[in-house]
Amino acid sequence: MLLESIQKNNLFSADTVQCLNDCIMDVCTTSEYVADGKMYNRTHKWDYYDDANKCIREILDPHLPEGTTINQSHILESLYPFELHSDVSHSGDTSTPQYTVIIPLDDYKSQTFVFNEYNESSNDFEDYKTEYTGELKLRIPKETVLTLTHLHPKDLMYLSIKETFEWTKGSFFAFDRKYYHCSDNYLKAGEKSKRAILLWTVEQ
């Protein structure tokens, strides 16, 4: 069963967002993802349930979907737009996946697109394409296609848009980890990077 999405605009004040950012950056471990000679993103991970991070939980917990447990928490600093993927599967994780949660840490001229298409077991969009038996037809509005120039045009013919999330500071978006999703090409819109709190939840 797929979960209903939750979207709340401007849920957290600017002061609260700054507090979250500062608290997380004080306790996080930073790693970089580099491929083909360029850095795609930095990930600032922290242990959500560590006693030292109680102040972070006190801010976030009241707004999380009921019956969820956080199994990964990090600030994502994206330097290149994410392509099509789901978050359903992660190495060593045998729990039942629930939500991906995004909380932007600033205002950005950027959107996350969630598509109606999903996968129960794989993050890789190529796996979905291999099993696809439907008609290849462009069902995405042309104005949206123009924001997805980092994707292969043919891939868009497998997809239809479920919902769109605007990256505004302190907003909250939770959607089922099984759905394929991606960023727009925010570089084309003039943004050099973007940062957000990302949480992955599983069944308790």
Which residues make up each language-model segment?
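Non-heme Fe(II)/2-oxoglutarate
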Residues: 1-74, 79-84, 118
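Catalytic core of non-heme Fe(II) oxygenases with the double-stranded beta-helix
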Residues: 79-178, 184, 189-204
